[in-house]
Amino acid sequence: MKMKIMDVNLNYQRYGNIKGKTIVLLHGWGQNIDMMKPIGDRFTKDFDIVIFDLPGFGNSSEPKKVFSCYDYVELIHQALEELKVEKPIIIGHSFGGKLGLLYASIYETEKLVCLASPFCKEIQKVTMKAKLLKTLKKVPLLNKLEDFAKRHMGSTDYRNASGVMRNILVGHVNLDIKEDIKKIKCPTLLIWGTNDEAVSIERAYELEKLIKDAGLVVYEGCTHYAYLERLGQTISVLKSFLG
């Protein structure tokens, strides 16, 4: 399904229990809807599921101007208004988690889940594609996503981004949102891997301290894609947190 928001053709999926509370799933940079469906598909009985292809990814068009992270958040908010969603539960991975943090600092949010989410500048040691492909190969249930990753992720995020998306990426990487995070009031769950080389585990402990009502779950030996590497455990933790 598609809608036009802020001059972007926004692709999304909505499924599950329309009478339940809404879970909004936000993927990371260079990814798309498919990377969050392993979570969404397991909550269809009790929750209304909304997954977006963020602007510039998947089947959503690129922004016609350079979007800031705040622009992405405003677009998400307008899209949810169009879908008549109020006070969503937001689950975001990496870049999507950063947008979730900003969303919850501005708009009323039921609960927030951040999966390895950056919030200040971090020096990356290895490419996101290399880590993702390694993770997908190790997890049997996620093998089908390996081809997707090969198609949709370049050797580096920056090199493969178009002019507009490249400038958006630079803005995202350099944006420090610590002061915004201090405004978050909703219950927040953080899930991190100890071997995350994109957003270090030290950042997870720092983020936990910045949010008034936050809890941290750490997966020993897992990477930036810890939520997929321990998918069963992730689902169990989420069920407990979401109630």
Regions found by a protein language model. Give the residues of each.
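Alpha/beta-hydrolase fold catalytic core
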Residues: 1-23, 44-47, 86, 120, ...
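Flexible "cap/lid" loop of the alpha/beta hydrolase fold
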Residues: 98-140
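Active-site loop/oxyanion-hole signature of alpha/beta-hydrolase fold enzymes
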Residues: 51-89, 236
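Conserved alpha/beta-hydrolase catalytic His-Asp/Glu region
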Residues: 123-186
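Catalytic histidine-centered segment of alpha/beta-hydrolase-like enzymes
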Residues: 222-231
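Short beta-strand/loop motif that positions the catalytic acidic residue
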Residues: 184, 190-192, 196
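Conserved alpha/beta-hydrolase "acid-adjacent" motif
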Residues: 197-203
